[in-house]
Amino acid sequence: MKLTVKLLDIENRGVLLHCTDARSMRVRDGDRVQIVDEATGKTAQAHVDTTGSLIEPGVIGVYRPVNATLAVDEGTPVEVRGAERPASLEHIKKKMDGGRFTKDDTVDIVRDIVDDVLSPGEITAYVTASYINGLDMDEVEYLTRATVETGERLHFTRHPIVDKHSIGGVPGNKITLLIAPIIAASGLLIPKTSSRAITGAGGTADLMEVLAPVSFPALEVQQMTEKVGGAIVWGGATNIAPADDKIITYEYPLRIDARGQMIASVMAKKFAVGADLVVIDIPVGRNTKIATAQEGRKLAREFIDLGERLGMRVECALSYGESLVGHTIGPNLEVREALAVLEGATEPNSLIQKSLSLAGIALEMAGKAGPGQGARAAADILRSGKALEKMRQIIEIQGGDPNVKAEDIVPGECRFDVNAPQDGYVIELNNSALVTLARLAGSPYDHGAGLLVHAKKGTRVRKGDPIFTIYADREWRLERAIEVGRTLMPVLVEGMVLERIPHERWV
């Protein structure tokens, strides 16, 4: 059927048909059509929405993402015809029924995700099926390789290339802002592609964006890394492992991070940037993704095994995950805390020690420090000011202000102190509840939003002492966080005597 294009400036991978045209073509909402610009030969496949009033018969509404492929002008005549269901839908249905993906199944699915053949609902079905039924190690390898092969790769002439990753689950984990410049200052290359927050209140890319732009094409990431030793960028802008970033888009609203997909996501990006040596941080503890050390060791073995399949040397570190790293959650607050350490601050100890330990593992793997001497070598680089200077170089080459100081980074203007209800000790910090409050306050999208935790687990407090402060850029977000915070109880305070049990209760 010949239809005339009407461009619709809406972010939707589909087209809009008048219901009479849809009936003539025997297509319904959710079906697919193929659009062909016969003048240029360009084609695109899209799912269908129908309307009886928004457009006229004889017109096809083309949403912005579809026209990124077609590149047609308003009023262009195009040929529109029904399209077959992609085979990848049958593969997804098989996984929903408890089956397993073959290598070819995985290639079909990943290619259709990258080419925008699958609708948002279909990608969500894939994410959910993989989450519920899991992926075995062969399926994880298939997904990793397919994710890399459908995107760009970096090719360095100097080796080894070092990379690190934290699987998340613990708030305030701003360690990359220290580890990357320490490793780069040692003379190694670290092209750190990072993701934005999925279930947390700020991914590394969200934090780095406070200091400098993070969206760069792959070639520029390689050039920046070769010039100054490192970069901290958003992987979603590089076309490195593009399927992964699209999958993350659908994991985010569900707040799920399927284990097999998580392993493939991490390792695909490391493989694509040419990493030889990889350090994986696995936080362990209640209210984290990994509850026990036994489970953490199992996950570590899976990372190491996949690394061997891909030709990378991987080492993992189980880290304490029952309390936030440092005292801050949210982009501006975390960046300010990390910059202060680079500038010479000796607190917070949890941030400094974790960063030095993980950087030290990388230095030992690369032969820059002897066995057991890595953390000390990393500390020497930090204390000497070389890491700060390297971070300034990274900020500058990415287009930020290299002279920025910790004191220049300020939290949101709206704030609320949550005070201790009684004298006692902080006996628990609920990570997931703290993250929920930070997100309600606007983090990570509002850079000034987040939490400053004054009293961590084991701290003695007096009634009325501030336990944590909520910051927000907008008053209504702060009010919402306060309202929900009254029911979440993210921090528990108890006296040394937990409960009095009188004689009368047992008479």
From Swiss-Prot:
AMP binds at residues 169, 195-200, 204, 265, 289. GO terms for cellular component: cytosol. GO terms for molecular function: 1,4-alpha-oligoglucan phosphorylase activity; AMP binding; pentosyltransferase activity. It is an enzyme of class 2 (transferase). It catalyses: AMP + phosphate = alpha-D-ribose 1,5-bisphosphate + adenine; CMP + phosphate = cytosine + alpha-D-ribose 1,5-bisphosphate; UMP + phosphate = alpha-D-ribose 1,5-bisphosphate + uracil. SUPFAM superfamilies: Nucleoside phosphorylase/phosphoribosyltransferase catalytic domain (SSF52418), Nucleoside phosphorylase/phosphoribosyltransferase N-terminal domain (SSF47648), Pyrimidine nucleoside phosphorylase C-terminal domain (SSF54680). InterPro entries: AMP_phosphorylase, Glycosyl_Trfase_fam3, Glycosyl_Trfase_fam3_N_dom, Glycosyl_Trfase_fam3_N_dom_sf, Nuc_phospho_transferase, PYNP-like_C_sf, PYNP_C, Pyrmidine_PPase_CS. Belongs to the thymidine/pyrimidine-nucleoside phosphorylase family. Type 2 subfamily. This is AMP phosphorylase. It comes from Methanoculleus marisnigri (strain ATCC 35101 / DSM 1498 / JR1).
